[in-house]
Amino acid sequence: MKVLDVLKKNKDYGRVCRRGKSVADRHIVMYFLDNNLGRCRYGFAVSRKIRSAVRRNRARRLLREACRLNKEKFPEGYDFVFMARRDMTDLKCQQVEESILKLLKRAEINRS
């Protein structure tokens, strides 16, 4: 099982969201920033506009699993923060994966 290197500190999330670039679609906003570490780190956030904690946790799990399954498609040396815009609990994991891959393509980050 591939394990993701996850952003843990609030300042790391803030740095990526403030200084980084973003691309978005209907369900997800992806922020990304070069981290000069030679490895990818991932962060996942869900808005409290999604009222139920169960639904927020499901959205977070969907995002995390989609990133884990496509880890090799992410360029090295970047921090990524994925934010769920709206309730994603009706989506399947494959739909979330497709959405994330489209965002990666739109971001035009060169894979090293």
Curated annotation (Swiss-Prot):
GO MF, one annotated term: tRNA binding
What reaction is this protein's catalytic activity?
Endonucleolytic cleavage of RNA, removing 5'-extranucleotides from tRNA precursor
- Record key words, sorted: Endonuclease, Hydrolase, Nuclease, RNA-binding, tRNA processing
What organism is the protein native to?
Pelotomaculum thermopropionicum (strain DSM 13744 / JCM 10971 / SI)
Q: Which GO terms describe its biological process?
A: tRNA 5'-leader removal
Q: State what protein this is by name.
A: Ribonuclease P protein component
Oligomeric form and interacting partners: Consists of a catalytic RNA component (M1 or rnpB) and a protein subunit.
Q: What Pfam families would the database entry show?
A: Ribonuclease_P
Q: Per the record's keyword annotation, is Nucleotide-binding included, yes or no?
A: no
Report the protein's function: RNaseP catalyzes the removal of the 5'-leader sequence from pre-tRNA to produce the mature 5'-terminus. It can also cleave other RNA substrates such as 4.5S RNA. The protein component plays an auxiliary but essential role in vivo by binding to the 5'-leader sequence and broadening the substrate specificity of the ribozyme.
What family does this chain come from, according to its entry?
Answer: Belongs to the RnpA family.
Q: Name one GO cellular component term.
A: ribonuclease P complex
Give the gene name. Answer: rnpA
> Which HAMAP family did the record assign?
RNase_P (MF_00227)
The record's listing under SUPFAM superfamilies reads: Ribosomal protein S5 domain 2-like
User: What Enzyme Commission number(s) apply to this enzyme?
Assistant: 3.1.26.5
